[in-house]
């Protein structure tokens, strides 16, 4: 498992990691990817946009997320959260740089990746991106803060190969 404490506040403690990994591994497949609603958005890139202007990924089904919720609650007993992102990326899928500035909070991204994929971020458009690779065939946790005004956490995702489950939790510590 890989952890990235981007905001410096610590990454929420994960309990039952093996159980969560097992469940996300079942989702990170070609068969699941092809069964979900695939979406693509395209337009003129805008780094300051709250949501990615250009995106390609699949939305994980509501039934799967409802069934996954009790496990997420068991895995993260020290936080209260709401799920704000539930996507499966396939080979070549990505979302471009955006801020999520319309929903400021602390955010935990949980990923399970079967291939080469990454999350990149920066705090200023003048800075280079800091790329954080996903742990292959395992879990990656990233904790960071979203703000409604600068400095933003500009971020994007690339899935070069394999499949990448991404679950976003807006959270507060208990």
What are the residue ranges of the model-derived segments?
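Non-heme Fe(II)/2-oxoglutarate
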Residues: 1-78
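Ser/Thr- (and often Asn-) enriched beta-sheet segments in non-cytosolic proteins
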Residues: 3-5, 140, 156
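Intrinsically disordered, low-complexity segments enriched in small/polar residues
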Residues: 6-8, 41, 83, 90, ...
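Intrinsically disordered, low-complexity boundary segments flanking structured domains
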Residues: 66-76, 109, 130-131, 156
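Catalytic core of non-heme Fe(II) oxygenases with the double-stranded beta-helix
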Residues: 79-151
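Ligand-binding loop in jelly-roll beta-barrel domains
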Residues: 149-166
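Conserved SAM-binding loop
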Residues: 167-171
């Amino acid at each position: 498992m890989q952890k990235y404490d981007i905001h410096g506040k610590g990454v929420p403690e994960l309990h039952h990691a093996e159980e969560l990994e097992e469940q996300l591994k079942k989702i990170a497949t070609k068969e699941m990817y092809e069964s979900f609603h695939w979406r693509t958005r395209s337009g003129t890139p805008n780094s300051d946009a709250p949501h990615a202007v250009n995106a390609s990924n699949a939305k994980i089904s509501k039934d799967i997320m409802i069934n996954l919720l009790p496990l997420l609650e068991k895995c993260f007993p020290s936080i209260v959260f709401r799920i704000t992102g539930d996507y499966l990326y396939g080979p070549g899928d990505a979302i471009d740089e955006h801020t999520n500035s319309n929903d400021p909070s602390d955010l935990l991204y949980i990923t399970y990746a079967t291939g080469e994929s990454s999350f990149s971020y920066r705090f200023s458009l003048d800075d280079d991106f800091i790329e954080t690779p996903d742990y292959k065939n395992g879990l990656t946790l990233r904790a960071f803060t979203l703000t409604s005004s600068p400095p933003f956490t500009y971020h994007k995702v690339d899935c070069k190969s394999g499949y990448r489950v991404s679950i976003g939790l807006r959270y507060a510590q208990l």
